[in-house]
């Protein structure tokens, strides 16, 4: 029961995700700046994934953010990048995690990408989460 309370306290308020997506949509519509929302999903019960998310958060730029959904899922918002650049950033972060911590087992993490562009019509939480965590949109 104590573990459950710890896990729940590490999850963010759902309003934060709505605000982060609103900020990305505003950057796109007001300034024609693309942003990429990255879904981070691990296996249920994976003890290493929270460490990966902590590492990602420690390496982010000031304009980037992480939203923790559950112990095994998070959303990363990268401002002023396109999808190709976001994929490079995620790869660099994963390599940095591996180099810094040399885990005995490589973390099993799936990433989904949603690019917020100036002409993107729907940046609602529901639409973005479906795009991020649908099995066919991960690699």
Language model region names:
Residues 1-6, 20-23:
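Charge-rich, low-complexity segments
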Residues 6-16, 28-29, 45, 63-68:
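Catalytic-site/binding-pocket detector for metal-dependent nucleotidyl cyclases
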Residues 15-20, 43-63:
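Active-site-proximal alpha-helical element of nucleotidyl cyclase-like catalytic domains
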Residues 17-42:
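Active-site-proximal structural segments of metal-dependent nucleotidyl cyclase/transferase enzymes
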Residues 25-29, 53-81, 99-104:
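Conserved helix-loop-beta segment at the catalytic/binding core of cyclic-nucleotide signaling proteins
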Residues 34-38, 68-82, 102-132:
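A short glycine-enriched loop-to-beta-strand structural element that forms part of the catalytic core
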Residues 46-53, 84-88, 116-139:
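Catalytic cores and conserved motifs of cyclic dinucleotide signaling enzymes
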Residues 87-104:
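An amphipathic, aromatic/His-enriched active-site/gating alpha helix that lines ligand/cofactor pockets
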